């Protein structure tokens, strides 16, 4: 009900700013632990970077050779999502191909690095790779199958929000953080604008989480903190 009267202040354990994949996930995690959480989003859920991505659920294979730590983190989270949010994941798998000009020397190194990071990496015949993906380059001389997948970011974020609310979290969309509340050099809450009614309200918490994604530096600036971020756009050709 947008006509409700807001109290002057309302107390929570944690306030999360940003209703994308990260913010929704934090809200759910907190609520499952019995932490009273408030999620604030200036637009609608998943309208930022979360709603503008390729939806690839990385296995971590692409990082295995050069960044094992990231590869291990990817496969761990990959498996968690498949287990707890299978309705949001399409288990497509992924193919890493070797062309004649590449040779097969790197393939062995790649497979070894994947397996060392805990990532399934199956060397398959090029004919099998073409059966799995008919549009692949038929000139390939090698192929490795890894557990990449596709994730629906809208469904996943919405599912996290729904579950967070079911466990006691409060979620306010179209609520923009105007400023932070401070006491003795500590952030103690936020001042918020309801962008639909024009009303303002204050919410307090022991912890405030900045989950604003690429806009996080603007949020941090309101708290007097400089976070150096360089926004970058990319394109995908299919």
Which residue stretches match the model-derived regions?
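Short hydrophobic core segments
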Residues: 17, 203-213
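Dinucleotide-binding Rossmann-like beta1-alpha1 core, especially the glycine-rich loop
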Residues: 55-128, 132
